[in-house]
């Protein structure tokens, strides 16, 4: 079967960075990252890897300081569990949102997709940071799940459009992550015209268009392991 997904006209190779769309991925690790603009807001970051890519493919080094070391066999990427960071807040309706409670709910959903709910319930932690570190140990591994990866586009200083990947919000339309081989799947199907899946950026110096279609020279996904 022939497919050009992930290829560029410049090289014909699959990119080492995973992109938007529907994929099977495994979770190599989970980090709980403080946002640079708000010390009370955190992102749950899933460090994912696709199924092994065959053919003329070279994945990123697992250790950037060891140029002769092993490489990832699949495409990799950092995926925010939610389009928005987790933070204590009060909605206009007056409803209070607890950061830690929402984080725990997210991990419950992920653990159930991986069939690891019992292990999650066995975790004992004194802080949310400790809880998330233990979740990373439990929920990372070789098991694959189906995901729908959305993104917020952003333009770098060289004018290339890149993707800040995230899992689209769970809604009546479906779920962004699901176990393999689920009967009556509710997995979201990626739709580039759905703003829940893709938040497009308007290219600078291109006032007449709100959609950027990269050329072979402008495939500028930045990824720093």
Where are these regions (language model features)?
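Short beta-rich binding modules
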Residues: 1-225
């Amino acid at each position: 079967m022939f497919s050009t997904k992930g290829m560029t006209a410049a090289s014909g190779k699959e990119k080492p960075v995973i992109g938007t769309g529907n994929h099977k991925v495994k979770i190599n690790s989970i980090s709980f990252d403080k946002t640079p603009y708000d010390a009370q807001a955190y992102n749950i970051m899933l460090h994912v890897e696709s199924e092994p890519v065959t053919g003329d493919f070279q994945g990123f080094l697992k250790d950037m300081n060891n140029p002769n070391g092993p490489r990832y066999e699949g495409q990799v990427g950092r995926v925010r569990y939610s389009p928005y960071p987790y933070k204590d807040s009060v909605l206009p309706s007056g409803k209070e949102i607890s950061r830690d409670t929402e984080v725990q709910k997210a991990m419950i959903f992920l653990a159930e997709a991986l069939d690891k709910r019992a292990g999650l319930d066995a975790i004992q932690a004194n802080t949310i940071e400790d809880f998330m570190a233990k979740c990373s140990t439990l929920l990372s591994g070789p098991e694959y799940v189906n995901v729908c990866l959305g993104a917020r586009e952003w333009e770098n200083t060289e004018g290339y459009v890149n993707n800040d990947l995230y899992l689209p919000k769970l809604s009546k339309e479906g779920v962004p992550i699901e176990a393999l081989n689920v009967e009556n799947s509710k997995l979201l199907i990626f739709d580039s015209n759905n703003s829940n899946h893709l938040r497009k950026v308007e290219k600078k110096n291109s006032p007449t268009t709100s959609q950027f279609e990269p050329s072979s020279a402008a495939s500028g996904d930045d990824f720093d392991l």
